[in-house]
Amino acid sequence: MAYSKACYKLTTITILLLSFTLPSLAGNAENADVSECKAESGDLSCHNNKEAQKLKIIAIPSILVASMIGVSLPLFSRSIPALGPDREMSVIVKTLASGVILATGFMHVLPDSFDDLTSKCLPEDPWQKFPFATFITMISALLVLMIESFAMCAYARRTSKREGEVVPLENGSNSVDTQNDIQTLENGSSYVEKQEKVNEDKTSELLRNKVIAQILELGIVVHSVVIGLAMGASDNKCTVQSLIAALCFHQLFEGMGLGGSILQAQFKSKTNWTMVFFFSVTTPFGIVLGMAIQKIYDETSPTALIVVGVLNACSAGLLIYMALVNLLAHEFFGPKIQGNIKLHVLGYVATFTGAAGMSLMAKWA
């Protein structure tokens, strides 16, 4: 558990350092054509702050409830026999949710990062001459791989140290003194070795699931705050209106994916509901924050574009890596699906369905 907490903190610090360091590159961006930036804002007839504020007030509880339902459903699945961890339906639900998370990274977060970091509000050099969005996404994915591998390495070292310790026999001695002791050890050694191997594999898998759940939540939370902030700061009633339904579905399905990861991690009840709480409130919090700073927040300012673009790129790297490596690959190359061709096909159908549904949402959110 200590290693998963360390991974969570290290990833958070890395993203924060990136987002506060890179804005310094915007020093020359103030020379960008402001009028050209403002021209990107869209239909002026939709700009009605009073109407937009009313819609935002409706959006906050709606998105909060949708988020809570989505992330909580998998946690209650233990009481539903058909959704038990050993049932086929559980695998289908997990692959569906994994497809949703993959599409979130590719179809929602990464394009937003491209839009921000290639905006005409930023100077051509260096922002138009180097693909910062994909570069940061790649670095983010590699950092997640590095953190996860170091965590597992640290766990393996700790386990090997424990195995090297001398365990006293029942008589208190550290050595085998009698023929009876030798016979007892020979008869029981095979069973003990197998049992220790099973326990070690289970513990290692559990640690891996904890790391996955925490890093996945981090990527989703960063993205959710950014979405909420943009919505809260907007005075475009047309944009806000279309976002309400889209974000409700977005948070519902994304929450199901996160909830499945939290369930597999087998956290304590307090940790489960803490993670549920943070996922549920991040988008509404972002909306409230955006409303509070609406008068001073300029989404076309160089600093805002770079900070939001970097955060989106980092989040995209986290989500894409997690969906492909830790969720889909783990599921499809596991013995449960590999030994069942029908489940194999259904798993892919569910994955493509989840990805297609979330991709369709990209039209509105």
Curated annotation (Swiss-Prot):
Residues 1-26 form the signal peptide. One of its GO terms (molecular function) is zinc ion transmembrane transporter activity. Pfam families: Zip (PF02535). It is found in: Cell membrane. InterPro entries: ZIP (IPR003689), Zn/Fe_permease_fun/pln (IPR004698). Residues 27-56, 112-129, 232-242, 294-304 are extracellular. Residues 78-90, 151-210, 264-272, 326-344 are cytoplasmic. GO terms for cellular component: plasma membrane. The chain crosses the membrane at residues 57-77, 91-111, 130-150, 211-231, 243-263, 273-293, 305-325, 345-365. It comes from the Eukaryota. Belongs to the ZIP transporter (TC 2.A.5) family. This is Zinc transporter 7. The gene is ZIP7.
